[in-house]
Every structure is written in C-alpha cells, then in structure tokens.
Amino acid sequence: MSGNKFDQEKVDLHVLDPFFIEGTARVAQFGEQKYGRSNWMQGLTQTRIINAIKRHIAQIEKGEDIDEESGFHHAYHAAWGCQVLAYQHRNGQTHLDDRRWSESVRDADTKIGTCEGISGHTVPCMYEGPFGRLHPVDGEKDGLVMSFVQSEADEGTAQGDPIQQLQQMISEWADQVYPDRTVENALTKMMLHEIPELLHGKAMDPAEFADVAILLFDVAHLQGIDIAQAMREKMEINQARDWKIDPATGLMSHVKPKGMMETIRDAVQGIGDAARIMAAPSRLLNGNNMELAEYTAETLPKPPEKPWEITIPNWALKTEEGTHIKLRAGSGVFGRVKYQSQCILMHKNMRKRSHLETYYCATIKDTVTEDEYNVPWSEIEPWTN
C-alpha cells in the first residue's frame, strides 16, 4: 500500500510513454515535410539540429508548451532532434558534424577506435556496457578537442585577410579559456562592462576599444558569422545611403526615403489621423506626392472640440465592390457626383472602431465623376495599415 501511495501518478522512469512515441512520430512527419528537401540535398548538420533543440527547450522554459507552427508539444520536437543526432553518430555520418568542438577518446588504445570528423573533429565511439554501447570503459577519460570550424574554401581567404585571422585567433583563445560561453554571456559583458567603460572616461584607451572588439568578434564567431564579409556588405549599403544628424539626439542617422504616408503626415501634422485618406480622386493618387499633400492640407478643416460627437451619414460611407473601394453614388446630371463636406478619411474597419477614434472630415471642393473615386486596393492598403 505504501508503494501505491508514493508511486501514484508519477512518471514510470523505466518505460517509454506510448503517447510520447506517437507524438514524436507525428513531429517526424512534420519535420519531413519542412526539412525533407534540405535533408535530401545536403543533410542536416549537427549545429542546425542542436540549435533547433535549444529553441524548443527555451520555449518550454519560458512557459510555452505547444509549438504554434506544428501544434505539437515542444518536447516532441526536442526528442526528434535528439533522435537525429543519435542516428548520425550511430551511422558514422561525420561529414555532418560541424560543431565547434566535439568529444573524443584521446587514448589510442581503444576497443573500437575513433572516427575522424570534419575540420579536425573526432567523433567518440563508445564501448560495450551493461545496457549496450552506452558507457566508456572504466579508467578511460574523455577530452575536449577545440578547433575553429572553417571550410576549406575559406582557408585561403583567411590566410590573407587580417580581420578573419584576428577573428580566428580570438575564437581559438576563447574556446580554450571559456568553452561553455554563450552569445548572451558575451553580449551581457560587452553591454554592462566594456561599453560603459568607454563612455565614462576611457575612450582614449586603445585597450578598452580592443575589449569591445574582441567580444564583438567572438559573438560573431559563436553565431557562425564571417564578420569581415558582413562589414563589407554593410559598408556598401551605408555608402549608398544619405546621412544627417538628428537634431533631437545629436546622433548621425541615415535618412529613410519618405513614402506617400510620411509625406501626407508631414503636411497635416497636428490633425490626428487626418492623413488616413480612404478615398481620394485617382488623379491625385497617381500624381505627385507633394501635390496630394498640399491638396489634403487645404481641404482639411480645423479639428472640432468634441470629435466624438461627429455624425457620419450612412450615405457617405464607402461600399466595397470586388477589389475596389467605391463611395456611395449620389445624384447629378450625367451621373456626376458632387461631394461637399463628405468624410473621406475612413478606415476600412471604421464601423468596428470606437467613437473615440472617429476620423475627421475633409471637403472635396471639385466636382468629379463617380469613376474617379474608384481606387484599387493596392493603392489604398499602404494608407490604412
């Protein structure tokens, strides 16, 4: 009876849960659909699998159990990744071992020996134990082999590129001194220790600059980033941009090209959401942005003191026909519609929004035909997001 008391509803550690096996099998099917082509073309490297396992474990730690993409528990995904790693090891697929370091049996006097991996790595071959090939022979020691992972194609470039040589030197030293470090460790030290030292009186000390650069280079290495190539590509982008000093912060920033929405907002600044024009004459939409901005600024009235009291008549609301937005037709000779003081600042979801978010009105002074108000969705969407 005492055994039942303590064992009730606890996990049986000596058996495999059939529901867990089924869940992992379903995740395997999901993985085949998502990664099957990549696996068939070149195989899944161990670093990629390990990173996927880490992501799922991290989500569990954050309190999320179910993966939004697959609908299965994150534990099933992690188990599937572990299965792939075990399969690659068991079948000697050393060409997929791209880990920065890997365990190896250094003693040459082994029962089975070691399998040579890529980039100087060695894959450990374990010995027969009481439950199969799980445990090393008593008295044998496992060691860590540190090596900088670099493809043969990059070796020639690294020999002549001082930045890549420097990154390699930093990573090899860091692997020996702090092999279990993470990206978060390096970034935290850089942000909380090294950079504040530069900001507080040590900006003239070359060693302090070097400390920041060393951490930055190591973070790039941990992420598998060739920092030299990344800087070259980024500089090409920076050289093509326009730069100016932000008067609010005093910092240099690149100038983002203004689109239609930004141009209108500048012209009607201080009038709330007046820039959200839902239906304007197509001749203006297809014209110059500044012409549209000036036209909008002229037609906008002053904001009322109580905007929530604005009443928008039903006949002024838009209608939707197919892929176009269309204002309700009025009356007039030859089908010409004259819109005077009608609300054209409408959101496509306006009827569902609260009265406090009522948009202001504008007046279209010109007399235009109904067809001129037919605007394709593709031209309206950027204005209403």
Swiss-Prot record:
Catalysed reaction, written as an equation: dGTP + H2O = dGMP + diphosphate + H(+); dATP + H2O = dAMP + diphosphate + H(+)
Keywords: Cobalt, Hydrolase, Metal-binding, Nucleotide-binding
An example Gene Ontology molecular-function term: metal ion binding
Root EC class: hydrolase
Cofactor(s) needed by this chain: Co(2+)
Domain of life: Viruses
Listed pathway(s): Purine metabolism
Disulfide linkage: none
Enzyme Commission no: 3.6.1.9
Keyword Transferase: no
Function in brief: Catalyzes the hydrolysis of dGTP into dGMP, which is needed among other for the first step of biosynthesis of dZTP (2-amino-2'-deoxyadenosine-5'-triphosphate).
Family of this protein: Belongs to the Caudovirales dATP/dGTP diphosphohydrolase family.
Protein name stated in the entry: dATP/dGTP diphosphohydrolase
Source organism of the structure: Acinetobacter phage SH-Ab 15497
